[in-house]
Amino acid sequence: MKDANLPMDKLEDKKHKIRPFSCLLLFPLLLLFMSLVQAQGNRQANAAPSPTPDGDEIDEGDVISVSTSEVMLPVTVRDASGQLVTTLTREAFRVFEDGREQSLSDLALRRVPVDVVLMVDASSSAAANLDDFRRAVEGFAAKLSPDDRISLIKFDDRVELLQDWTQSRVQLRRSLRRIVPGMFTRFNDALLLASREQLAHARGRHAVIVLTDGIDSGRGYTTLEMALRALLEAQATIYVVSNTEIERQKKREELDSLLASTPANVRFNELRIGDLREGLRVLDVSERNLAQLTAATGGRLYRPLSFDKLDATYAEVAEELRHQYALYFTPLNKKRDGRFRRVRVETTTPSNKVSTRIGYFAPGK
């Protein structure tokens, strides 16, 4: 088992350092990211593509990389009532890349193992509920296939890898006991490092499941759009179990209590009332950013009303991972130009809701 801090020196140069809570300025995140991608694409537009080498072998768990031309899309389908749809055939799907319909391969529905990075926000705001997280994760791990692997990262003042890839639930349980709380939240750094370091050694489907309020304290070097790009490059689906609603309830109750007191008490607590209102605004913006982050990667945002609900929430994520479709296609666009390509998946039932990532980066030269 590897027990080390993830290498912080592999982050971007310090010129990218951001101010506290600057992630709140990133909405709408997807528009900003797509503008950056478009700028990159314009710079590469005149580059001549390299020929595709012959004889590339594609193993069962392969996803798009420099060494393969086949693209794998993890796809979740829900009906109009929100229930998982698990019985579709290949003929029920249509896949589009940059608006152009693609042909699915014969291997469109094969079962692919999933490598899951479990991440926990161990900052002071979550310290009192780590036992609930440990219990929920153990239940989650028990519901995965024996072929699936798990790694564990905690983030606060530091981003720390507590458990490298393992199929051992015993090792995971031991690592969960080693989570100790810190003070601050390096959320963006944690996403970047999970994508570029941990998922670089993953196979099959890639998933990140994180418990957090999504509020980065701005003490790292990574912006939220940088983290999103890294997730898309790693072809990771992110599921966020957000405690924003739990924190919102606490702040609203305190704010309502203060506002209901006498005018003299309201004046006396004016600073605290202002802090609570600003805290609610920060939670709202953070939640919108988390919703865009999960939507862009084909994941899902969960907002349990109490930490007692974590067991059920993580069980729901495990259920979704067990019933994802793995759709494979070989792009009609053969250029190896490293550009971002938007994808869209539809089903023959218009009322179905299909979730997958917004696109992928083509192989480079």
Where are these regions (language model features)?
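Scaffold/interface architecture of coatomer-like assemblies
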Residues: A39-K365
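Bacterial N-terminal signal peptides
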Residues: C23-S35
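Cleavable N-terminal targeting peptides that direct proteins into the secretory/outer-membrane pathway or into
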Residues: K15-K17, S35-Q40
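Compositionally biased, intrinsically disordered/low-complexity regions enriched for serine, proline
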Residues: A4, K17, L25, N46-S50
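N-terminal secretory signal peptides that target proteins for export/translocation
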Residues: M1-F21
